[in-house]
């Protein structure tokens, strides 16, 4: 806007279009609302400015060390320095100095004689025994990037950095060398009172609620989520599939009996290519430094075609540290390399087994399953247990987290929630978007209890004399939990004891009851594993 403003008072006018040509690419199942749903920021930048930074990582095979590179783009002439993990060391670029913590720091000069407006400056640091980021242990470092001009600080940026490696090896998705299982949900951005504008307090509630119910992953269905939500996923520990703002199911569902794709968007239509790829680039460039994002998704229910394949290739070229997801390859197998994993929706477990027997080349996830409309989710354990029977099956994402109801008051003054058709809208999908685990005002339904049990990281089986505990965590020992043993007879509490036990991730421990069950009456033993609080670890104290 620099060329448009002038000294003194300026008037800024914003015109918001309800529909545009891009609306053809936004056929998601949600309320059609108009306006500005997120914060808009107007800012000035100094003469020397950090235009961009991309944090890249590599690790020793045993994760005993890490190499962290900050690729910075700077406009203007000045000095740029990077402080990593709270302390700065001065050194020329390319000659880093090492200090006792094992982290290497650098300081570089942006060349004022370079003619280009933007200059590239890179810093590489070595970290010994890095604290790795995961949903179980969301450890974050702090990087501070400072730009100086004429001996004065012109700009300072603080960036949380999570160190982790996500990869595809031997047909399995691995996080920090361990096979991951996604115990996830799909989440639309929704508030029953403010529509598609979600407050920070509501986002924080969602993250805490998901963590409290053993959910470890979120698919941002079907568009990039608010950056603050991604920040919360970094801090509290949730794995994220970052999804491109693309869905055109209304066009590809018109495929003819002969399989012609004259209706499908984007397909291979050249007029849509740039618009589609621009959406992918915008998401990646905005969100690329969030450790929570493990997978880029090409969108939802947009069939297939060369354009989507080109999007996947863009993701792989621009960011090799993440995998690429697209469920549409199940429907259109002409571009199978679009997705690094097989992905389906609402497939019964028996059919998943049959598919993997015939197509064992890639790992498999359910990007949508266990449709949570009404009194549902009763069969979820069939899926969660299968993830520990078949290594290629690596979990899924429940559809969906929240009911999309609008808070209203009826003529009698009674509060409630409206859905499709309640405003005289015809045709209507009626209650089709009221299909969540929580109500529109974020109250949990009994379905959340079923999810909490099915997604539990500990599988506890009781005999007459002991508890057999299978630790399904990737990185957390059983000693992190309080094990509470409580006995009852005919429903009346009898004895209670708490203990700790060691059991490494992936192993099973047999723990004798701390006291015997009464022989008379209907005796029952209950074992509860309690892990206190949502872990949020950050060296800079966000």
Each language-model region and where it sits:
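Substrate-binding/catalytic cleft of secreted carbohydrate-active enzymes
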Residues: 207-210, 217-437
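Secreted/periplasmic carbohydrate-active enzymes, especially glycoside hydrolases
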Residues: 1-240, 279-280, 294-295, 311-317, ...
């Amino acid at each position: 806007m620099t060329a448009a403003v002038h000294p003194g008072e300026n008037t800024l006018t914003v015109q918001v279009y309800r529909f545009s040509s891009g609306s053809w690419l936004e056929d998601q199942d949600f309320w059609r609302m108009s306006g500005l749903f997120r914060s808009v920021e107007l800012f000035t930048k100094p003469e020397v400015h950090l235009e961009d930074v991309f944090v890249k990582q590599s690790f020793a095979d045993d994760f005993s060390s890490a190499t962290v590179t900050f690729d910075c783009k700077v406009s203007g002439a000045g000095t740029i320095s990077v402080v990593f993990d709270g302390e700065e060391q001065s050194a020329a670029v390319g000659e880093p100095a090492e200090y006792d913590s094992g982290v290497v720091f650098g300081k570089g000069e942006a060349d004022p004689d370079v003619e280009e407006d933007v200059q590239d400056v890179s810093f590489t640091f070595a970290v010994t025994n890095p604290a790795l980021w995961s949903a179980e242990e969301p450890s974050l470092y702090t990087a501070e990037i400072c730009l100086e001009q004429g001996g004065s600080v012109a700009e300072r940026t603080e960036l949380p950095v999570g160190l982790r490696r996500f990869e595809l090896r031997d047909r399995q998705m691995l996080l920090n060398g361990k096979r991951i299982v996604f115990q996830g949900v799909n989440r639309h951005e929704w508030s029953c009172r403010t529509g598609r504008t979600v407050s920070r307090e509501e986002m924080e509630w969602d993250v805490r609620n998901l963590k409290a119910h053993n959910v470890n992953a979120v698919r941002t269905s079907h568009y990039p989520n608010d950056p603050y939500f991604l920040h919360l996923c970094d801090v509290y520990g949730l794995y994220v599939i970052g999804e491109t703002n693309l869905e055109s199911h209304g066009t590809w569902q018109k495929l003819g009996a002969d399989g012609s794709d004259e209706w499908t968007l984007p397909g291979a239509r050249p007029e849509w290519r740039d618009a589609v790829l621009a959406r992918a680039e915008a998401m990646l460039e905005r969100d690329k430094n969030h450790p929570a994002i493990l997978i880029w998704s090409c969108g939802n229910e947009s069939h297939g075609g060369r354009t989507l394949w080109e999007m996947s290739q863009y993701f792989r070229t621009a960011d090799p540290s993440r995998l690429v997801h697209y469920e549409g390859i199940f429907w259109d197998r002409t571009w199978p390399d679009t997705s690094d994993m097989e992905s389906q929706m609402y497939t019964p477990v028996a059919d998943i087994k049959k598919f993997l027997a015939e197509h064992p080349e890639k790992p498999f996830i359910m990007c949508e399953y266990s449709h949570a409309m009404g009194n549902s989710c009763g069969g979820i354990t069939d899926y969660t247990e299968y993830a520990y029977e078949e290594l290629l099956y690596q979990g899924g994402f429940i559809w969906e987290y929240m009911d999309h109801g609008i808070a209203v008051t009826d003529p009698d003054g009674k509060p409630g929630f409206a859905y499709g058709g309640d405003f005289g809208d015809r045709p209507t999908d009626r209650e089709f978007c009221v299909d969540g685990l929580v109500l529109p005002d974020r109250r949990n339904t009994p379905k959340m209890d079923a999810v909490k049990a099915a997604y539990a990281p500990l599988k506890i089986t009781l005999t007459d004399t002991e508890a057999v505990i299978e630790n399904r965590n990737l990185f957390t020992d059983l000693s992190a939990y309080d094990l509470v043993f409580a006995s009852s007879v005919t429903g009346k509490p009898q004895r209670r004891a708490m203990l700790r036990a060691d059991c490494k991730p992936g192993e099973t421990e047999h723990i004798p009851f701390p006291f015997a069950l009464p022989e008379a009456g209907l005796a029952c033993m209950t074992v509860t594993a309690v892990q206190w609080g949502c872990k949020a670890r950050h060296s800079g104290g966000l």
